[in-house]
Amino acid sequence: MPTSATAVAPSTGSVQKKDQDWRAILSPEQFRVLREKGTENRGKGEYTKLFDDGIYSCAGCATPLYKSTTKFDSGCGWPSFFDAIPGAIKQTPEAGGRRMEITCAACDGHLGHVVKGEGFPTATDERHCVNSVSLKFSEISSQ
């Protein structure tokens, strides 16, 4: 079933579950990354080299997060995007201020980090470095 590219993110924090409920629906690796703020191994993610047309949603709650049109190859070893679907993610500064943690606005699942000012030739000069295991890809079928 095609996914709408104009999907609107639900209100902040609207998906809340207990750890036992998250464990029931997530793989152990998804739980470690999304709920415990882990990081998957560099270059091993399912979506690192995928550049098909579609939508990347939160693996925890299915909130649409990124359009494939904002994905680029940064060479960092994780899927990279230069912008998110408006309202879909939250950015929280980390100690030192060099990067921001990004989480799903709906379920607070850890996605990865945003680094700014690296000089990539994108519209925002931002790199949203996202764990593949935090994402679920849905292809947009062309008719």
Curated annotation (Swiss-Prot):
It comes from the Eukaryota. It catalyses: L-methionyl-[protein] + [thioredoxin]-disulfide + H2O = L-methionyl-(R)-S-oxide-[protein] + [thioredoxin]-dithiol. Coiled coil: none annotated. InterPro entries: Met_Sox_Rdtase_MsrB, Met_Sox_Rdtase_MsrB_dom, Mss4-like_sf. Keywords: Cytoplasm, Disulfide bond, Electron transport, Metal-binding, Oxidoreductase, Redox-active center, Transport, Zinc. Zn(2+) binds at C58, C61, C104, C107. Disulfide bonds join C76-C129. Gene3D superfamilies: Peptide methionine sulfoxide reductase (2.170.150.20). The keyword Cytoplasm applies. Its EC number is 1.8.4.12. This is Peptide methionine sulfoxide reductase B9. It comes from Arabidopsis thaliana. The gene is MSRB9.
